[in-house]
Amino acid sequence: MAAHCQVTGAGPGFGHSISHSHRRTKRRFDPNIQKKTYWVPSLRRNVTLTLSAKGIKTIDVRGIDAVVADLIAKGVKL
């Protein structure tokens, strides 16, 4: 699964794991990505989105219709 949120655009970050002796090794910090299905009344169908936890909260606040309208305007395939 791609580690990118379709709503916020959040992707992986990169940094170091630091051991007790302070040796640094490269690592990747992945966002909390979930697949979630919503019923979209304006489209009259279900839409499955790949979302971060922040993206889910954004949909809770703004509403699924507003978020899907923005995604369609950006050209995201749903």
From Swiss-Prot:
Keywords: Ribonucleoprotein, Ribosomal protein
Keyword Ribonucleoprotein found: yes
Gene Ontology CC: ribonucleoprotein complex; ribosome
SUPFAM superfamilies (alphabetical): L28p-like
Ribonucleoprotein is among the record's keywords: yes
Pfam (any one): Ribosomal_L28
GO MF annotation list: structural constituent of ribosome
GO biological process, one term: translation
Region (Disordered): 1-30
Similarity comment text for this entry: Belongs to the bacterial ribosomal protein bL28 family.
Xref: HAMAP family: Ribosomal_bL28
NCBIfam families: L28 (TIGR00009)
The protein's name: Large ribosomal subunit protein bL28
Source organism of the structure: Micrococcus luteus (strain ATCC 4698 / DSM 20030 / JCM 1464 / CCM 169 / CCUG 5858 / IAM 1056 / NBRC 3333 / NCIMB 9278 / NCTC 2665 / VKM Ac-2230)
Gene from which this protein is expressed: rpmB
